[in-house]
């Protein structure tokens, strides 16, 4: 934050005519070309090893093209200074975000240190020219420099009237990984001596040694450690701890040592010509655009179509020129609470580095109010101007030099979820923005924070972090360690908070997962069973924590040097993946009345409906409370794991050697299923409920363990003999179960299974209708690949409906549709739509089958693919729009051609991921369905695509 406070500063001659209201004599480009810099005669190229460390695409830092300046028809250098600018906030594509905002602040009359921005188009021309400055550009840069010199009454390289500069990159989109800032450019021995005569030796030579460090590292790629070694050795030899304790004499000596480091590393002396320094810095910024880290950042974030980076050259101002100077950072509103009050820090007689290094503790802004009342009043006025102008909370950096305020930067301020919602609502109430604009001010991640518990003070536990895994499900959890699902349920029944620690979870663990306050797994990715189920329930989860070793037998987990046994306290941060020792204090979800107001605006705008994935009445109620417009996916197989009695009935059905015995088990399951459906219909009174028929492979209902234990348990539960049980297990075993005997294939082979589930749905719907509940059941057939498969199941379902309706003498409306999760189904969607009244894309399996990735095994290679830029996102987290997305669009278009009123949506994990939701909205889908806890996030994403 404060590191950049010192970036934009200027040294002015005491008593100079550089007053607040000073304006340039001319903003127009001069028709006479600026003189060529003296070093331009030095031919050719600076050695390519100057950029080797950053792996720059344009490795040589070339000298200025030795040619007469050529007039260009397109402007490439834009000036800015108080009251007048050649750019504005709308020119981010050309000036970069930083340059556009500097120009905007200057144009509305704020005191901005003057400077100029070299456009992104110039960077593009530089790249196109094979990393050589385009003809005429250097003359334009020198022209811009002369404008700044006239504005400030100071000259680059003049010891009597020294002008120092900062040089910074700035693309249209904020891009960490670009070139760092170069400060104090323009210093050499003569200028440092002149500066020392005016402002003191210590200040001058501290600035010089900082410049040598930054220029050497940032521009010439000399390892910073080489400079730091000299600094540390100097402090040790003097018995000092802090940089500020060094004397002027010490700093002078360091300057000499830093020059020796430069000479040794580059084989040539440090360039003393200030214009040569400026040239090399500009080239370094241009080259940084093609650095590996910048290209990787653009690839990962899908940033395309940009011309390059702009170069911002700005005069320096200093906050460390005595007790009438200082530096600070502030937010125009509290970024934690949203309160309309300035929130920030200020340091007297300091530069930003002092804050970053922790050398001094910053003071509240009230300190500035007391010490520099005139500058403070101007700062408050500027904050009000900027908020009204940008219509957003601003993050502002400023410096006061000898009682004069300089605005260094403004940008939209980062904030917490609670603050984001309050600021959006307050600004509408203040008449500053309209509701549609306010919707854009809150990020989906902000709502995620509001819907989960958080730690009171994350910085307080940093020394207690003992491992870090994947942040699989956000929020915070504090509980006592348990190692089995049964123990988690038992502890929960006793009113204890349990953290379930497993090597990995399975469907049989769902009871314990639901009972636990948090889940920690040794293995598994962001789409593992633990992660997916945790997100459905809004449970905090840290998965794939390779730094832990779980020992179920002894009920202990080893985390580094720590061994935790059952009952010991552990805390999890599901938003960061941190595993924290002990019992850390929690604060409840920060829900407020502002959130309801904000979400009402969201719902007024969006067209895409948002439903929820819910398997129990409690889930359904949570979904409804979070604004779900129905249930888009109710997984019937999850109901079977709800109790020992249910799982035994399922196993009896699986093991039954005859239809008669299988039907007996199904009759028991009918009672359970009917009761569950009644509860869900009741909770969703008046809203549609989509129930998916059994999808799990049969083997997932079998006990875990070695074959002898499985056989023994099955025999005890079902009455089968060991030989029959073993034969049945062998028959159920599959080489690739996720592509095997599951979904509609179960219902086709065992039609009585589909009949039981359909009967439970219709009987529950009739019972609830008789109680005055409005019921809209929709039955979804899973894993369909051909229209014949769907036709088989639809016929069975409609036959059951007719029988149930005839028995009770009453009918209800219902729909039968299918999941589109097999690529073939998407390709023949028109044929399938003849049988289906709705499509719901199961994007989890559709992604799995389209990529040929096993979801259970992607953790072995996806991280490598992401690290190498082969994939930009994990396709199980963020929809693959080019591949899977095209299948979604194709199937939707084909399906609606065959059935124009076809309802289409999705019910995979992507239904709660903001960029995926935006894609589905643009693709014309009718709904998305997601975890109950992500419903507000999907609602917001669906609205933001329209504003």
Swiss-Prot record:
Domains: entry comment: The N-terminal domain contains the ATP/Pi binding site, the central domain the pyrophosphate/phosphate carrier histidine, and the C-terminal domain the pyruvate binding site.
Result after altering residue 529 to N: Abolished activity. No phosphorylation on T-527 by PDRP1 in vitro
Organism ancestry: Eukaryota, Viridiplantae, Streptophyta, Embryophyta, Tracheophyta
PTM sites of type Phosphoserine: 506, 528
Database matches in InterPro entries: ATP_grasp_subdomain_1 (IPR013815), PEP-util_enz_mobile_dom (IPR008279), PEP_util_AS (IPR018274), PEP_util_C (IPR000121), PEP_util_CS (IPR023151), Phosphohistidine_dom_sf (IPR036637), PPDK_AMP/ATP-bd (IPR002192), Pyruvate_phosphate_dikinase (IPR010121)
Function in brief: Formation of phosphoenolpyruvate, which is the primary acceptor of CO(2) in C4 and some Crassulacean acid metabolism plants.
Entry comment on modification after translation: Phosphorylation of Thr-527 in the dark inactivates the enzyme, dephosphorylation upon light stimulation reactivates the enzyme. More highly phosphorylated when grown under high rather than low light regimes (70 vs 900 umol photons/m-2/s). the degree of phosphorylation is strictly regulated by light intensity and the light/dark transition has no influence. Phosphorylated in both mesophyll and bundle sheath cells. The phosphorylation at Ser-528 may be important for the phosphorylation at Thr-527 and may also be regulated by light intensity.
Pathway: Photosynthesis; C4 acid pathway
Gene it is expressed from: PPDK1
Induction behaviour: Isoform C4ppdkZm1 is light-inducible.
Remarks, miscellaneous: The reaction takes place in three steps, mediated by a phosphocarrier histidine residue located on the surface of the central domain. The two first partial reactions are catalyzed at an active site located on the N-terminal domain, and the third partial reaction is catalyzed at an active site located on the C-terminal domain. For catalytic turnover, the central domain swivels from the concave surface of the N-terminal domain to that of the C-terminal domain. PubMed:1668653 shows the existence of a second gene coding only for the short cytoplasmic isoform of PPDK.
Region of interest called Disordered, as start-end residue ranges on this chain: 21-54
Activity regulation as described: Activated by light-induced dephosphorylation. Inhibited by dark-induced phosphorylation. Both reactions are catalyzed by PDRP1. Inactivated by cold due to the dissociation of the homotetramer. Independent of circadian regulation.
Name under which the protein is recorded: Pyruvate, phosphate dikinase 1, chloroplastic
GO biological process: photosynthesis
